[in-house]
């Protein structure tokens, strides 16, 4: 077994042990993971996605005290074995493959393993029970191997963003800008789970400006939720063909207050309230109600969004993507919380930046 496969197998085995401990505490017979997010987590970076916008994929994972089984059909089995769960047995997985037209055979197989006992699931059906909240929270704390994958993803997603905005021109349409962004991500083996683009006219109108045929004009925003190995790198950048708006300085101060509240042992609601105070200090109190501020990220673009009452405790190993905004301007990066504080995973040293309270933060790219 190669060193890479050994590391992946160790990660999978640790996660299987966690699931089996959960089974014991819950008195359940099996855990059935249907979502592409949980598939990526339990397989240490595999993908069950074919339709990229779907929440569930072409395979599930069934875990009992004795087995860990990939449930799929004949269409997908060979590719999953060879490309997504390479060395399946070495990782701890077997396969149950059913004919694509006889999906009921999968259900019979699950019933044969679980009997009439409780089955837990991330997306429960037919009497299954939801996963314990503690297990969902445990997924938010990323291990060393996950953090390594995340760092590589963040770096390459930021490079893709910079590449596209440096090439952008005022006569490009929003579709062209978004298409160039998706191309730059795919070329790096990254799924463009979300690519938003808006030009000069639409920027101040909508907080979620899906692209259109309009030319971008004097300024544009590009947003990525970029997925690889199940993890999401979320970032936003702007280009201005001329001077950037002065408002970016005020927004950077708002963001600095929010980021400064991200500390192990605090709650996610404390970060929300820090943003609330910062908007009020900037005389932009209404902005808090015009868009959410982001929150914890990881195997979803937002695992948990910060609200006034989100009691989730913050821990080292969690990833965050906050997105404070005014009308027509936003700032967003993906950070990992470590022993020394927040580390920006989507930082590009070649992108224009300002030192804001000791942290390098992105400015608008000004093209003259």
Language model region names:
Residues 1-368:
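Active-site neighborhoods and metal-handling regions in enzymes and metal-associated proteins
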């Amino acid at each position: 077994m190669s060193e890479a496969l050994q590391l992946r197998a160790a990660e999978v085995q640790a996660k299987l042990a966690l699931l089996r401990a959960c089974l014991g505490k819950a008195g359940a017979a099996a855990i059935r993971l249907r979502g592409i997010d949980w598939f990526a987590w339990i397989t240490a970076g595999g993908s069950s996605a074919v339709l990229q916008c779907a929440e569930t994929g072409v395979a599930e994972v069934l875990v009992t005290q004795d087995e860990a089984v990939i449930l799929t059909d004949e269409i997908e089995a060979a590719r999953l074995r060879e490309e997504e769960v390479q060395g399946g047995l070495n990782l701890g997985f077997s396969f149950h493959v059913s004919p694509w037209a006889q999906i009921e055979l999968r259900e019979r197989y699950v019933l044969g393993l679980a009997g009439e006992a409780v089955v837990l699931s991330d997306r429960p059906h037919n009497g299954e029970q939801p996963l314990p909240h503690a297990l969902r929270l445990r997924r938010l704390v990323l291990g060393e191997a996950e953090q390594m994958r995340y760092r590589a993803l963040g770096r390459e997603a930021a490079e893709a963003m910079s590449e596209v905005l440096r090439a952008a021109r005022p006569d490009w349409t929003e579709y062209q800008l978004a298409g160039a962004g998706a191309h730059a991500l795919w070329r790096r083996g990254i799924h463009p789970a979300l690519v938003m683009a808006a030009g000069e006219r639409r920027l101040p109108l909508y907080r979620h400006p899906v692209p259109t045929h309009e030319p971008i004009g004097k300024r544009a925003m590009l947003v990525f939720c970029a997925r690889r190995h199940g993890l999401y790198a979320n970032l936003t950048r702007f280009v201005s063909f001329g001077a950037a708006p002065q408002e970016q300085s005020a927004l950077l101060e708002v963001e600095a207050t929010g980021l400064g509240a991200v500390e192990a042992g605090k709650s996610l609601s404390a970060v929300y309230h820090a943003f609330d105070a910062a908007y009020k200090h900037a005389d932009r109190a209404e902005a808090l109600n015009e868009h959410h501020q982001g929150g914890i990220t990881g195997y979803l673009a937002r695992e948990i969004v910060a609200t006034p009452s989100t009691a989730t405790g913050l821990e080292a190993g969690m990833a965050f993507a906050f997105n404070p905004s005014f009308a027509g301007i936003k700032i967003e990066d993906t950070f990992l919380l470590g022993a020394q504080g927040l580390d920006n995973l989507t930082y590009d040293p070649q992108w224009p930046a300002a030192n804001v309270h000791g942290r390098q933060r992105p400015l608008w790219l000004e093209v003259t």
